[in-house]
């Protein structure tokens, strides 16, 4: 019987650029579900369970922070790692 793989949801509008990181995690035994928008991330959280979520802050449509608030209503105990290129302290404090 195969061991359960930890499941990662990764939401980023530039997900194609993250392919090497996704492949690395998959090689380490993680199941990675990539999505390209905040709404896609919310929909996935409604349909599936995840062990951790990587969430880009700067996405078209819902921002990462807006998406985070919806995800925390659906799956309050799942850890979320906010990912951003921005060094604005206000974004870090809000997250």
Named regions from a protein language model:
Residues 59:
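Receiver (REC) domain active-site loop signature in two-component systems and cognate sites
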Residues 43, 65-75:
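Short amphipathic alpha-helix used as the core "switch/output" element in two-component signaling
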Residues 36-40, 63-66:
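Acidic catalytic/metal-coordinating carboxylates
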Residues 1-7:
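Non-catalytic signal-transmission and effector/linker regions of two-component phosphorelay proteins
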Residues 66, 87-95:
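Alpha4 helix (beta4-alpha4-beta5 surface) of REC/receiver domains from two-component response regulators
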